[in-house]
């Protein structure tokens, strides 16, 4: 995954395009599927069972070697990873604070509120949220962000604009990583 490689390079202070050993890559991205579908479908098509204990062990190892650790979800809070596990189960297994990423598009208000409620019910701390502009044509973005602030009870820790630059995925990932670093430092201060 080009984004994972770019983020791995940025996290290590190396230039984009740096080659890594397969073991290094697998430690930060143990599951990578080609099909852009729900994780449980992609895993089944690849003949792989997502193992939450493996992810927990890799996360513990990475946390021991680094100042902070970010675990990116896929598909949403309740997205199934298998017939028996979901992203919510993974978050509970890791027992880390949760940063909600709100995909800014039509329907995001309802989706964000329901997700925030589910996270809080899980017992995990919801430390904040960021806005990720998915739909560059969405009208009334400012009004939706203001309503999200009111409904979620806090201002966004970051607002990530839609990438209109036409930059390659690696450059976009590095730019996002720089912005994300600021957000993570804010979250670390909230703990």
Q: What positions do the PLM features span?
A:
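Structural motif
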Residues: 70-72, 99-101, 130
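Switch II (G3) loop of P-loop NTPases
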Residues: 55-83
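Short glycine/serine/threonine-rich phosphate/pyrophosphate-binding segments
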Residues: 77-82, 107-113
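Charged helix-capping and loop-helix junction motifs
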Residues: 82-89, 113-116, 141-146
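N-terminal phosphate/diphosphate-binding loop that engages ATP/GTP or pyrophosphate donors
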Residues: 1-49, 53, 58-61
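Inter-motif core of Ras-like GTPase G domains
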Residues: 82-105
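C-terminal lobe/tail of nucleotide-utilizing enzymes
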Residues: 117-191
């Amino acid at each position: 995954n080009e984004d994972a490689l770019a983020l791995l390079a940025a996290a290590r202070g190396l230039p984009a395009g740096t080659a890594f050993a397969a073991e290094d890559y697998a430690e930060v991205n143990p599951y990578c599927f080609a099909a852009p579908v729900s994780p449980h479908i992609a895993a089944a098509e690849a003949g792989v069972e997502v193992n939450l204990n493996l992810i927990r062990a890799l996360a513990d190892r990475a946390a021991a070697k680094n100042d902070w650790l970010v675990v990116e979800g896929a598909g949403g809070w309740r997205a199934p990873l298998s017939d028996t596990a979901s992203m919510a189960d993974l978050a509970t297994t890791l027992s880390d604070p949760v940063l909600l990423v709100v995909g800014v598009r039509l329907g995001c208000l309802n989706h964000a509120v329901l997700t925030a409620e589910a996270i809080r019910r899980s017992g995990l701390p919801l430390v904040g949220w960021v806005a990720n502009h998915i739909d560059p044509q969405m009208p009334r973005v400012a009004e939706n962000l203001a309503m999200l602030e009111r409904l979620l009870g806090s201002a966004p820790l970051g607002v990530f604009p839609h990438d209109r630059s036409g930059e390659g995925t690696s450059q976009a990932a590095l730019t996002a990583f720089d912005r994300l670093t600021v957000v993570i430092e804010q979250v670390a201060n909230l703990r």
